Curated annotation (Swiss-Prot):
Biological process annotations from GO: anatomical structure morphogenesis; lipid catabolic process
Residues modified by glycosylation: N80
Gene Ontology, cellular component aspect: endoplasmic reticulum; extracellular region; lipid droplet
Top-level taxon in the UniProt lineage: Eukaryota
The family this protein is said to belong to: Belongs to the type-B carboxylesterase/lipase family.
One Gene Ontology MF term: carboxylic ester hydrolase activity
Signal peptide boundaries: 1-18
Function: Has no esterase activity.
Protein name: Putative inactive carboxylesterase 4
Originating organism: Homo sapiens
């Protein structure tokens, strides 16, 4: 009796999801509607709804460089969330190498670079027509705080196999993400503050994607693990996540912690472009 019932239940579930597949997934976030796509994984009747390139903050351009991330601008149209956002500005060869070396996806992602990078991707196996609340896992990519991107890591298999909502996030890298004058004019750690902004967005919006904002795990590898460690220690991250997995890398990794006066080095760089450095404020503004 059990086997026929199980077969019928499986067929019913497949038929229900087949109906959902006739139209792409549409979710209303606090900033506006996003349109994703269903992707099926071999061996699973239930597809995964995938949303790519959702903005969680304003583009950090112009006067927003070297400042706190600002909330994303709302939109009054349906935003297409079916293509990957650009990687943050970085060395193209190194970025391509890291992308190809560490990716878990089969297809190649065209290399696009931009300072406009504060986007996240969501992979959810939840039935968005119901009030499902699945655990959430937020992935922070590695790359030495210099290279890398969310698009390198495909959350499809993890979402389908473990029945969790997977979020992969991006943040500012290199000098744009970690430049500091060592004082209040430009305290630095902009990249880590971007990660906090993404976690705030998750708290505010992930329930609409079938995720449980009260069960968020952050995890990352290499310098992504360092970022996890930083967030665990930061009082600014209180109540934004509930579990943490640091896959190598910690907050006090020696190569990532530098002390000293940044002004002499900055003066050398600015002389190359014939700019005068008078104050930390002018340094931040002209960088």
């Amino acid at each position: 009796m059990w086997l026929p019932a199980l077969v019928l239940a499986t067929l019913a579930a497949s038929a229900a999801w087949a109906g959902h597949l006739s139209s792409p997934p549409l979710v209303d976030t606090l900033h506006g509607k996003v349109l994703g796509k269903f992707v099926s994984l071999e061996g699973f009747a239930q597809p995964v709804a995938v949303f790519l390139g959702i903005p969680f903050a304003k583009p950090p351009l112009g006067p927003l460089r070297f400042t706190l991330p600002q909330p994303a601008e709302p939109w009054n149209f349906v935003k297409n969330a079916t293509s990957y956002p650009p990687m943050f500005t970085q060395d193209p060869k190194a970025g391509q190498l890291i992308s190809e070396l560490f990716t878990n996806r089969k297809e190649n992602i065209p290399l696009k670079l931009s300072e406009d990078c504060l986007y996240l991707n969501i992979y959810t196996p939840a039935d968005l027509t119901k009030k499902n609340r699945l655990p959430v896992m937020v992935w922070i990519h590695g790359g030495g705080l210099m290279v890398g991107a969310a698009s390198t890591y495909d959350g499809l298999a993890l979402a389908a196999h473990e029945n969790v909502v997977v979020v992969t996030i991006q943040y500012r890298l290199g000098i744009w993400g970690f430049f500091s004058t060592g004082d209040e004019h430009s305290p630095g750690n902009w990249g880590h503050l971007d990660q906090l902004a993404a976690l705030h967005w998750v708290q505010d919006n992930i329930a609409s994607f079938g995720g449980n904002p009260g069960s968020v795990t952050i995890f990352g590898g290499s310098v992504g693990g360092e970022s996890v460690s930083v967030l665990v220690l930061s009082p600014l991250a209180k109540n934004l996540f509930h579990r943490a997995i640091s896959e190598s890398g910690v907050a006090l990794t020696s190569v990532l912690v530098k002390k000293g006066d940044v002004k002499p080095l900055a003066e050398v760089g600015l002389r190359l472009v014939r700019l005068r450095l008078d104050t930390p404020t002018s340094l931040a503004l002209c960088s």
